[in-house]
Amino acid sequence: GEKSQEIIKATLKKLQDFGPDYWCGYSYSWFGNMKARAFDGEGAADALRTFAECFCLPNTFHANGDQTKSGKSKFTYRPFTLEGNFAFAAGIQEMLLQSHTGVIRVFPAVPVAWQDVSFDKLRAMGAFLVSAEKVAGQVRQVRILPEQGGTLRLAIPEGCKVASVTGNKGDKLEKEGVLILETEKDKTVTVQYN
């Protein structure tokens, strides 16, 4: 709820205010994930960009210390680890798709500059493969392939209206900004927005 969001935002601000002097590379990709979960696309992109630019070698290996010596961390060593790269990839997915609340949200934490963005078959909780497209800053289409079938809850993106739904089983219901549909196994549901 709203109170929880206030606590989360205050906690993230406190982490940032303390400063990252002794953060290592994966701390930035971890922080990017938290920013994405808090629906802060700008903050998520900034943290992930810092990870990629300052803590990865030209071959994309994560070197843990600030390789640019730009002050992003007092650690400048080079131990190779994998978790930072994995967290970076997870952070990108969290920016594009979230479903941990039981409601699928597309593009919940993308920066304003990402006006044209799409993804194909990212996995959401409930055994759904989700694809979506955003053009000129507006979500245009979401395609969902249910691997098991069942009830689908899809958040209607801010500023969008559902134009059409195909592939669902039975009626569609819109409730408090969420589209609720019944799905069949392996039958793609397509939602168009205008």
Question: Where in this protein do the model-derived segments appear?
Answer:
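Catalytic cores of secreted or luminal carbohydrate-active enzymes
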Residues: P79-S131, V135
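Surface-exposed beta-strand/loop patches in extracellular or lumenal glycoproteins
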Residues: I144-G159
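C-terminal beta-strand-rich structural cap/linker in extracellular carbohydrate-active enzymes
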Residues: L154, K175-N194
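Beta-strand-rich interaction surfaces with strong enrichment in secreted/lumenal proteins
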Residues: F119-D120, V142, V178-L181
